[in-house]
Structures are given as C-alpha cells and as structure tokens.
C-alpha cells in the first residue's frame, strides 16, 4: 500500500510536467488496481504469517520468557554450528574424479557424445528392466488362480478353465515375446493390419519372429498356434463391421479375441518407446528384423490399426487375460440375471446397461436384433448408447467400442465419432428393439402400424419373422432381421415404451412371469422372439463358432441347458396359449350368441350397432389378429381410429399385461374404436389411445380397457328399478354390464356396456347371471354400448335417479364395497341399498340425476384404470333407462370368492397380468393396466342434462353434442398432456358438490372392503372421495355433471349447469390412480 502510494506520488510530477492528464487518469487506474492486488497480497500474508510461538520455535523471535540477550546468544551459537558443519562438508567432499565416475559431474576431457551415449544406455537399461518386469507380471487370470485377486467363485472357476485352455503355452515364455514385438515395426502395415486389428497378438509374432529366439518359440508356438488360429478366424469377422452377424456368433471367446486386437493395438502405442529401448539395448543377440523408424508418419486414422508395432505376446496375453476376465465377470453377472431378463421384458434399461458392459463386441455390432443374439452369452445385447456420448468417460467409450468390435485407440472425440452411428441405430432401433424383445406389449406399442393388438404379431414378424424363422435365419440373417426390427421399432412410439418399461420394472417378478405368459398367449411366436427366441437364436448361431472357440466351449453346456429350459418354457407357454385360445373360442361362441340376442333386440339400432361392433371386436380381441378385422366392421371401422389404436399400441404396453390377458382379447380394445360407439368401444385401445394423446371420442378410457387390464370383473350392479341390478363385469376379455333380467331390458340399454363380454366373468361364477342379463343387455348394450360403456348408465332417468339417490342415501352408508367378497349376486339382491356406492344420494335428492356412480373395485390390479366414454347414443340410452325406471345403481365389488378364484386362475394361466403399470399418458396412468377396472360409474343418466354420466374414470356422459365435443377437445388436451398426470388428477369433483364419488376402483390386492368405512361417509361425497384417496386406493369417480345435483360435493369441478353437461372433462382426469391421490382440491384440472 505504501509503495503504491509512493509510486503514485512519483508519477505525478512526470504526468503533471507533461501536462497530459489522460496518462494520469490511466495511471491512477493502474495504481488503483495495483493497490487492490497489493491489498489482497497483504491480506494473504497477514493470514498466513506465522504465530509468535512458531517464530520463537524457529529462533527468529526471542522468546517472551527469556531475556533478549539470551536469545541473541543462542542465535549466534546456532550460526556457528551451522558454519562448522558446512566447513566440514566442504573439506570432506569427494574429488572431482570421483564425482565424474559417479556421473555427478561431466568429464571435461571426454567426448560429450560418449557421455550422452552412456546416459542413454543407463536409462535404457533401467527402462528395459522395468519393461521386463511389467511384461512378466501375472495377468488378472493368473492372479485369480493364485487367489491374489478376490473374485466370485463361479467367475474363478471359469477363469481357471479358460486360462488353462487359452494361455498355458504363453504363460511360461516371456523371452521370445519381446523379440517378436521388437521385430514388429510400423513398417509392416499389411501383416499388421490383418493381425493388429483382427488377429490375436500371438499370431503375428509367430509369423514375424524368424529370430534365433524362435528356437524356443517354435514349440511354444506350435502349442499356441491352435488357439491363435481360432482367435484369428473369428476376430476378423468380429472386428469387421460387415461380418458382424458372424461376430455376434462369436461368444466370449470371439469377443475376447476380437477385442484384444484393438485393445492390444491401443496399448502397444504406449509400449512403443519400450520396444525401442529394447532394440537399442541389444541385450538379446537375435537379429532385428526391422528397426523402428522414428521418422515414419502414421496418419491418425491408421494409428490404432495398421502400422502399429504388434504387442509382444506377453503383453498381449495380459491384455487378453484382462479382457477374458472382464468378460467372465460380465457373464457371471448376466447368468445371475439370465432368467429374470429373458422373462422380464420390463427392465430395458438394466438390460441395456448390462449389454453395454458385456464383452460381446461383435454382437454389439450386430444391431438391436443381434443384441439379443449377442445375449447368446447371457441374455444381453450391447446396450443402447446414452443420448449424449460426451458424458461418458473415455474408459466407458472404449468399453462400448470394444463391445462393438471397433478400434479403441484415439482421442475422446475420435471414440465418440466411432460410436455415433451405433448411437443413432440404438436410439431408434434399440429402444424399439428392446421394447419389442422385451414384451409383446412393448411390441404392440412399437407397432403403430398394427393398430390393434396385432402390432405384437406384426412387430414380432418383423423382429423375428416368427420364432422358427428367427432361429433359422438368425445366424445368417440375424443382422438383417435385427435391422428390420430396428426400423420397425424406431418409427414406433418409443415414449410409451419407457413408461411401460418403468411400470413393468416396478412390477414384481411374478408380474413379469405372468406378463411373459400373456405375451406368449398374445402371440407365441412373438413372445419367443421377444426374449427366449432371441436367446435361442443367438445361442444357435453361436454354437457353430463356439465349437471352434475353446472359450465358448466352457459356456456351451450351460447355454445348452439354459436353451433347453427356455424351450421348455416356450413349449409350456405355447400350450397355455393354445388353452387360452380354446377358451377364447368358447367365449367367442358365447359372445356370438349374445351378439345375436343383442342384435335381435334392436333397441335403438345405432347404439346396438356400436355395441355389436364392440362385441365382435372383443371376440376378435380374443383372436388378436381378427380384432383388427373386426375393427373393420362398419361401425368399428368408422369408429375405429387408427390413431387410437396406434396410441393404444403405445398405451397397450401398459395394459398389455391386462389386455393380452384379456385374452389376447386385449385386442378387443381396437374393436371398440367404433366412432360413435367407437368412442366407448375404443375402450381399451381408445382408452389408451386417448391417453396417448388421441382424443378418442369422449372416451378417455373404456371400461373394457380396464377390463382388459383386470381380468377382474367390474360388477357394476346397477339396480334398475331398484329391482334389477346391472353388474358390469369386466372380465378378462371384456367389460360387461349385467343387469338383472327384471329391469334388464329397459335398463340394459344403460348397461349397454354389456357389449363387454364377461369372458372371464362368464367363466367365473359370475357367468351365470351375466348370461341372463347379457341376453337382455345385449340389445341395450348394443344400442347403448357407448352409454353403457360410458357409464353403464343404468337407471337412465334422472327422475328415477333422484329417488334412487334418496334410497341410496342410507345405502351409501353401506360400505360401497359390499365387501368385494359379496358376489355379484349379492349386489343384485340388494340393488336398492346398493346405492351404497352412490354417495349420499339422499343428500342429493334435489339433483334429480345424480348419476349413480358405480364403482367397481378391482382389487386385482393395484392400479385402477379409469375410462371415460361419451356414449354417442347416450340420450337414447337415457330415454330407455327413464322409461325403464330409475334404476338404483348398485355398486358391487365383484369381489366374491369366485372372483378371487377366477383371478387366481387367470393370473396363473397368464390371462391376466399382474399389476402391469404403464404410464404412457395421464390417461393410461389413470388406468394403469394394473388390471383395475375402472368403476364404470353406473351413473344413470343424469336425467336433466343429457345424461352426463361420467365413467368413474373420467367417463362423462354429457348431452351427446356438448359432451362429445367437449370430451373430444378435452381428451385431446388431456392426451396432449394438458391434464395433470394420472397421479395428479384429482378425483373428478364438481364444484356444485352435487356429485357422488362413484366408487373407487381398488386393486384387488387392496380390497376395498377394508375401505368400507369410506362408503359410510358417502353422505358427504367429498369426504368419501377424500377418504378413498387417503386410503390410497385408486378411485374412479364419476362425475355426474348435473349442477342440479347439489349434494355431490365430492366433485369440486365446477360443472356447468346440467344442460352444459360435464364440459370439463375433469372426469376425464383419470380417477384411477395407482396410488397416491393428490388432495382433490389441490389438483388443478385443466379442463375448460
């Protein structure tokens, strides 16, 4: 500070004398900055200065305790002692000659070149010794054998076996290695290119070391040569991208050999200096074949490959051991996950990660399809590359390159450039491919082309072109197949797959098993191809090579055994599939009968037509492929929206478990796409579609979708006229509304949902009642299919509803869950009280049509699926219902023992998948295929407004015109993501508070029975809704959009007047949440 001020003072005279003030200003600025820096320095010095104690200890400051004179004396003594010590050292220092001899001083009279040579020799000797030690250090395999490296026992056994096979010959010979490596020089581009990249290090040496050392080498090489040829044979293919299919065939052996090439090349670079030193050292008498040319220019693109000196065999052996060691570790890890992966399609990411780690370089090159082949070793493929390669470390990039048989030398940008093509392929193909392989549902998703569930098959065909075909083709055309698959997949919507993936991964392994069964049922060929098949293919293709490769042989028995197991599993799955198909046929027959009955009843021809199409679709759904055809049905076709299907495909993965379970009837979803009724019919497909952003008619999700999801039967017993109860059964294949025969006919239209065939339900004890109702229903169902689907609006007449609601008031108190255990029959028996689900109907007498809200709780799947349908013919259905009577909605938990048994059977048979949750979109979230059947709020028509019945899942039955329009718009918005995600969507709430929570759909696992208390609260619908949420059970709430219903507090959503209907598709917001529900009041519903 002082100095700077002094400087300033000194500077002033100059500046002032010059009379130039500009420099003065500049100088002031400079000085100011100097002062600042000086301040900082001073601050630092002050902070870092030694304490007085330290200064005292170092003799710099006198201690406070002792007098200053004493301190000075001590200091002088110290100095004297130091001086004496230095003088002594100077006297005893060695002579110059001695220093020269010790190379501390240079000889003035000697030639400088000689000295330099001596120094070089000395350094070279040191380097050579070090190199020798390094070259002869034990490799990881040897360390493992000697128990120096701790490894998993299985890996150790494999390593010991492999090590004995591959490396016995080279392990003992270290002398010739150096020579051969020395002999090799960048001058040998031709030989090295072939060898360096593809050949194992040992071979080049064999051919290129015609040195005296070969005396010992020949024998060694003779023994080594057998392995070398094998390595050389496969590695070239592995290394070269074109033959990648072959490379994939190479199992770990190939990989190891192939990798060694690039790896060796890369590592040889660092070693070059050492090699040079060795040659200079001339410690060996052998003649040098070639001297390294230091001036030779090696272009960067060739550096890692052609003109690099080959690694000495010792180093190569080390590298190979390391690679083998890593591969064996990966293999052991893969084996641990082997079964899980093949069966579990869900965890794509894990698989990919493993793949990326796996040492199958060639396989990776193969393409997403080969990945599966790749998995020959395990069930893995070179994992898909992350979106940004820059984030990867160099070591990770090199690992990826090795997996793909690419050179690993070069800078990070070079590595990234090499990996980019694979990144693109993987991003599109692998995501799709992985999905496809992963699960039929995923495949379905990927297959937008097949609008229906067919996608699975189609995808499958593209991917594997049939199980058998894949097997046959894979070895030769595995790559092409893979490529095709990639192409097919890449266009496919990948986004759904991630959600599916996540949902699947979250599921239990059991779920995965059931899922695989489902997939198999859906299309055995596809399932096979999806995982086991590919494995089989890979292993088959590998087998030829593996026979040649010694390393492969180690795993051959294991692989064979696994393959056999997989084949057995496939056979079992096929048998199950056949059984399921037979069952489907029977159900289809039943459906046919029902359909005919329904057709006969021409209640409102149009509605019936939709219902019919739905039914046919359902049947076809069971068929799977036929579904698509069914979709072609006039109604279906018109209603069918390819987009919905496509979205369904996407969404389907979620439901796939359920849908496929639905008995391959999942495809039914498609059938339900018929436009008018299609909306409802689109059921699952539309449901999913809508979730995917398609605005299927108002149907957000269809009961069927739920049904597909759950084999659980939704029994929405709607008591029509109080006497008849409509039970909606969402059997595996379809959702069915069953109305008691009594009011069945009139109510049936409402129940039109009958369109859903209770395939599973029929099969189960429910079946008997269903048939009766179905016959009556079918007509109505057909006529009303949309309505029914929408809301199973039983008791369409608002008048009826009001009284109904009044009745239910007490009923509501009953746990809306009449214990799922109560059979559907039970619910039928107590139709009037069944209003239990109808929340506080009594409170809402004023609002004539609080639609009855039927909540069917499907405990089966943890996630309830909510579906909203706009029944185009809703008004007609309402009319019918009104004419019929005011049916009392009865919410039955079709959760009787029969149902439990049925679910168990279905799950075992794979018809129903355990909770498979997919969140392709908020809607799909709402109705995670978790086989929870959305409660179809059997909101009977809200008589005043055109029945605004909303399926508990956001099913809103609004006046057809306004509702459908608003529903579509809102659906679009919802699909587009304007709606909060399913988890965020609050139960539909009507600000008029005149809505009743229709019901919760709970996972069968969480029986709503436990929540019967919530039903008791039904008097205050809002409470009910919240309690349900609190229970954490997915709640399907039906919004009856009658603002007339003042009592429905639970619906916070402001509903326009009854006439406007539920324009806000708040109902659309999936009512079903797999788990946490936000406080309804906190959830913003973006429906306008």
Swiss-Prot record:
This is Myocardin-related transcription factor B. It is found in: Nucleus. Residues 214-226, 367-378, 528-540, 829-838 have a biased composition (Polar residues). Residues 563-591 are annotated as: Required for interaction with itself and with MRTFA. It is linked to A chromosomal aberration involving ZFTA is found in 3 chondroid lipomas. Translocation t(11;16)(q13;p13) with ZFTA produces a ZFTA-MRTFB fusion protein. The modification Phosphoserine is found at residues 66, 541, 543, 921. Residues 165-310, 349-389, 472-508, 528-553, 595-655, 829-886 are annotated as: Disordered. InterPro entries: Myocardin-like, RPEL_repeat, SAP_dom, SAP_dom_sf. One of its GO terms (molecular function) is cadherin binding. Residues 238-248 have a biased composition (Pro residues). RPEL repeats lie at residues 40-65, 84-109, 128-153. One of its GO terms (cellular component) is postsynapse. There is a cross-link at residue 628 (Glycyl lysine isopeptide (Lys-Gly) (interchain with G-Cter in SUMO1)). Keywords: Activator, Chromosomal rearrangement, Coiled coil, Developmental protein, Differentiation, Glycoprotein, Isopeptide bond, Myogenesis, Nucleus, Phosphoprotein, Repeat, Transcription, Transcription regulation, Ubl conjugation. It comes from the Eukaryota. O-glycosylated. Residues 545-601 form a coiled coil. The keyword Plastid does not apply. Interacts with MRTFA and SRF. Acts as a transcriptional coactivator of serum response factor (SRF). Required for skeletal myogenic differentiation. Residues 197-213, 355-366, 541-550 have a biased composition (Low complexity). PROSITE patterns: RPEL, SAP.
